């Protein structure tokens, strides 16, 4: 009897997801922890590894199909694993996890006693067999660093943790090699014959596009949007970035204008805390957030993603620049985790990178404000009674009028303008 592998709950918030890509097909021989498929849900793409070694008998769910946690997605000929049970399987006889059997403690591994703080909310990537192995060894798996692909924890990592050593990197290279061997050139789509004077084709709405559509409609239906549009002379900002661009490059940092905007926005959120709240009309509550996490809208081939710079108030411009660049690469490669896209208190949308100027950005609900930045263009301005050319930045600030009054919104915009006009103030007030 084949082992039926069901779509698991792997701790990434996935309750259903679209099978974006299969890395295996019927007849393939696989090893435990090989990547079976990529599953996409609500803007994140997660790799699903195999819990067993064996031969793929049948792929049950086609690419582009949405599966629910617990659905059988692939059958694997793995006789030794038929009785294994995994989180997400709904068999009544195995609804509870068996506690580790009490046996004679012959050469029982010492319980890990490291005293470092452990983030109990941390998302852990590990196979069920590895989780069981960690329990048997008395190790809190959330304290273990993973050396496998995408940070996945292996048995060797648990052993290294027990020995007080660093995790081995051999598994990462092995996983990469396996991924390269399994990856195949996707077949070219069948040619479509267009007939008639007004030919049309249809396609299923991708999971990410559905998620984006749902979020946009919910935001516009829930929050009465008001958008303020303004502009500011950024000659000093231009010169400041130019001055430190080479210094940043020497330490491997690509310095752009966006980190300056992040710091200016954080300062505005602190000065006008109404912009750093959520408005819960159903509960009759306003949620005040005493942390400053900035979402950065990123355009990708899959659609709009919003990775988050956590605790932006605690980071330097160089640090923010590095983090934005790293998140942007992950976004383009489809490697962002759910954790990297949640927790924002306010968002920045940069239409300037596409050549845009002013626009009406949609609030990333349940946030109550979003700052849009346009292109920097040379424009004539009046300075000391004379008309001169200067680089001018376009700004658009949308806010939820249930929570933020027009004057508050404009005052916040003025504060951002003031800091971007004189970036040295970021050291004093940012």
From Swiss-Prot:
The protein's organism comes out as Staphylococcus aureus (strain COL)
What does this chain do? The pyruvate dehydrogenase complex catalyzes the overall conversion of pyruvate to acetyl-CoA and CO(2). It contains multiple copies of three enzymatic components: pyruvate dehydrogenase (E1), dihydrolipoamide acetyltransferase (E2) and lipoamide dehydrogenase (E3).
Domain called Peripheral subunit-binding (PSBD): residue spans: 125-162
Gene (name only): pdhC
Active-site residues, Swiss-Prot/TrEMBL: 401
Instruction: Write down the chemical reaction(s) this protein catalyses.
Output: N(6)-[(R)-dihydrolipoyl]-L-lysyl-[protein] + acetyl-CoA = N(6)-[(R)-S(8)-acetyldihydrolipoyl]-L-lysyl-[protein] + CoA
Q: What is its EC number?
A: 2.3.1.12
Mark out the compositionally biased spans (Low complexity).
Answer: 166-193
| Quaternary structure and partners | Forms a 24-polypeptide structural core with octahedral symmetry.
Residues recorded as bearing N6-lipoyllysine in the entry:
43
Family matches, as Pfam families: 2-oxoacid_dh, Biotin_lipoyl, E3_binding
Q: How is the cofactor bound?
A: Binds 1 lipoyl cofactor covalently.
Region: Disordered, residue numbers: 80-122, 165-200
> Keywords on this record?
Acyltransferase, Lipoyl, Transferase
Q: Name one GO molecular function term.
A: dihydrolipoyllysine-residue acetyltransferase activity
Name the coenzymes or cofactors required: (R)-lipoate
- Give the family, as the similarity comment puts it: Belongs to the 2-oxoacid dehydrogenase family.
**Signal peptide segment:** none
The Basic and acidic residues compositionally biased stretches are: 84-104
Protein name as it appears in the record: Dihydrolipoyllysine-residue acetyltransferase component of pyruvate dehydrogenase complex
What PROSITE patterns does the record tag this protein with? BIOTINYL_LIPOYL (PS50968), LIPOYL (PS00189), PSBD (PS51826)
Q: What class of enzyme is it?
A: transferase
């Amino acid at each position: 009897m084949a082992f039926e592998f069901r779509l698991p709950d792997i701790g990434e918030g996935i309750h259903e997801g679209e099978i974006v890509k299969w890395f295996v097909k019927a007849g393939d021989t696989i090893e435990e922890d090989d990547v079976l498929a990529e599953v996409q849900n609500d803007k994140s793409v997660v790799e699903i590894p195999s819990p067993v070694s064996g031969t793929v008998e049948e792929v049950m769910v086609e690419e582009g199909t949405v599966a629910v946690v617990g659905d059988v997605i692939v059958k694997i000929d793995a006789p030794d694993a038929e009785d294994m049970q995994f989180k997400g399987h709904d068999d009544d006889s195995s609804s509870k996890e068996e506690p580790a059997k009490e046996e004679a403690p012959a050469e029982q591994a010492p319980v890990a006693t490291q005293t470092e703080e452990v983030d109990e909310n941390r998302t852990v990537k590990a196979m069920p067999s590895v989780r069981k192995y960690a329990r048997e060894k008395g190790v809190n798996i959330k304290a273990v660093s993973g050396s496998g692909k995408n940070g996945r924890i292996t048995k060797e990592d648990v052993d290294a943790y027990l020995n007080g050593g660093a995790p081995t990197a051999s598994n990462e290279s092995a996983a990469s090699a396996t991924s390269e061997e399994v990856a195949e050139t996707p077949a070219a789509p069948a040619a479509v014959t267009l007939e008639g004077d007004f030919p049309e084709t249809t396609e299923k709405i991708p999971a990410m596009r559905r998620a984006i559509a749902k979020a946009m409609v919910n935001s516009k239906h829930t929050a009465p949007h008001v958008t303020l549009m303004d502009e500011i002379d950024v000659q000093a900002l231009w010169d400041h970035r130019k001055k430190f661009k080479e210094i940043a490059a020497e330490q491997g940092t690509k310095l752009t204008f966006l980190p300056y905007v992040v710091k200016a926005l954080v300062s505005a959120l602190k000065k006008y805390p109404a912009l750093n709240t959520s408005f819960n009309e159903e509960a009759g509550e306003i949620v005040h957030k005493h942390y400053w996490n900035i979402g950065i809208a990123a355009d990708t081939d899959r659609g709009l993603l919003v990775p988050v710079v956590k605790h932006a108030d605690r980071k330097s411009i160089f640090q923010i620049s590095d983090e934005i660049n790293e998140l942007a690469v992950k976004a383009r490669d489809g490697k962002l985790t759910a954790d990297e896209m949640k927790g924002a208190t306010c968002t920045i949308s940069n239409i300037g990178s596409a050549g845009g100027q002013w626009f009406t950005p949609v609030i990333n609900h349940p946030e109550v404000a979003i700052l849009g930045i346009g292109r920097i263009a040379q424009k004539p301005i009046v300075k000391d009674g004379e008309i001169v050319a200067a680089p001018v930045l376009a700004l658009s600030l949308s806010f939820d009028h249930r929570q933020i009054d027009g004057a508050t919104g404009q005052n916040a915009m003025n504060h951002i303008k003031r800091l971007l006009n004189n970036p040295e103030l970021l050291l004093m007030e940012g």
